[in-house]
Amino acid sequence: MNHSEQPFDVKEALLFSQRMAQLSKALWKSIEKDWQQWIKPYNLNINEHHILWIAYQLKGASISEIAKFGVMHVSTAFNFSKKLEERGFLKFSKKLNDKRNTYIELTPKGEETFHKLLEDYDPARTGIVKGAQPLHDIYGKFPEILEMMCIIRNIYGEDFMEIFEKSFSNIEKDFLNERGRVTKKSEELEDSADAAEKAAKANQIV
């Protein structure tokens, strides 16, 4: 088989891709186990929890957006969203100007469950945190994995990374670290934070 000339060494590319594949597989095995143990008390699977996570961030996402940002097939996104609707965690809707797409949104029960899941998170039971602990001890923070994020951006696009970043900034904004637990901010604190953010933006404009 003829290969067109590449701007890099083919053997180097092979070793890189296989190194990434095998490390990702090993890492995913640990992450999958941690994730399943975390959500097991709520009788959720990983796809269902991921859908709740995305629905919380997007506040009215279409099924196609859930599939795109959840890295799953559209039928998978729809079927698991339907199960979450049956359990009262999601509500489905159509838009008057867009009858083709189905949109989902968290119900009060779904939002409460999402909050409880974050509050129940225990880093002591998380293999990925334990594995990164020595790096945190040395540098005072967890790895930022910037090179990995650059690769993902080049594969999945800027929109994907914008939602990815937004999801974590929303958690930063809406939740507190309180006595070793992640807890939802009170409405008073949220209003105060929103006011401060608006004031900061106004000052930047001036």
Curated annotation (Swiss-Prot):
Keyword terms, alphabetized: DNA-binding, Repressor, Sporulation, Transcription, Transcription regulation
InterPro entries in alphabetical order: HTH_MarR-typ, HTH_tscrpt_reg_Hpr, MarR/SlyA-like, Tscrpt_reg_MarR-type_CS, WH-like_DNA-bd_sf, WH_DNA-bd_sf
Keyword Transcription regulation: yes
Keyword presence, Transcription: yes
Residue ranges, annotated region (Disordered): 186-206
Domain HTH marR-type: 13-157
One of the GO BP terms on file: sporulation resulting in formation of a cellular spore
DNA-binding stretch(es), residue numbering of this chain: 63-86
GO MF terms, alphabetically ordered: DNA binding; DNA-binding transcription factor activity
Entries under Pfam families matching the protein: MarR (PF01047)
Complex formation: Homodimer.
Function of the protein: Negative regulator of protease production and sporulation.
Protein name: HTH-type transcriptional regulator Hpr
Organism: Bacillus pumilus (strain SAFR-032)
